[in-house]
Amino acid sequence: MGDGQAAWAAGPCAAEQARSLLAVAWSCRVTADGGREEFVGAHTVADDGRVLLRVPEDSALAAAAVPAPRGEPSAVLEFADVAPVPVRSRIRARLWMAGWFLPADEHLVFRPTRVVLRRPSGAVVVDLDEFAAAHPDPLAGVEAGLLTHLADAHPDAVERLTRLVEPESLHAATRVQPLAVDRHGLTLRIERTRAQGDVRLTFHAPADDVAELTERVHVLLARAAAAACPRTLQRQRADGDR
């Protein structure tokens, strides 16, 4: 869901977003042979996007390590992208990968034949060649710490950034939180009493590391300081609008 400036504008492509999600996801849900198992901290990702999964010897997934007849997928992997900052609807995206497992040393190697990414704007089928060639966003591994620090230590800066948001997007807003950041920009979650929306603040140039990100955010804050101050965020009663 987005309002105000176009959400996800000048952002990562679907393949890069899928690889970023895969790189930082901590848990993996696997559906195979009619069963479903959840694995936590058990997967790594190869450079070409294959998933290496460590499973117990008695796992039912051992049976899924043989390709299905006619090359049909034998398993579906699901990953969730959870916002590190407490907000409503914390699932920012989901990634589904259909394919099959092959045994290799101490791992099962999952080779995807179909990759689907569901974002707030809808679901998209990711091209397999683009998925294999893509790299995670350079800030993906530090995003959680950056966002929680911004929300906890610099709420004044977050509110100042709302000066860059169209006034109609802030109507009846009760809280604004940093939702996501990548090398292209920062996304704010604008919460209202009964709804929420996301607004994208695009950087003037990509940020490939934390130092560059700091500079990009300072530029946004400078722009915000020069902008007209928006109407103060309304503090609604917990029991609803008046």
What are these regions (language model features)?
Residues 1-242:
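Binding-site signature for planar aromatic cofactors or substrates
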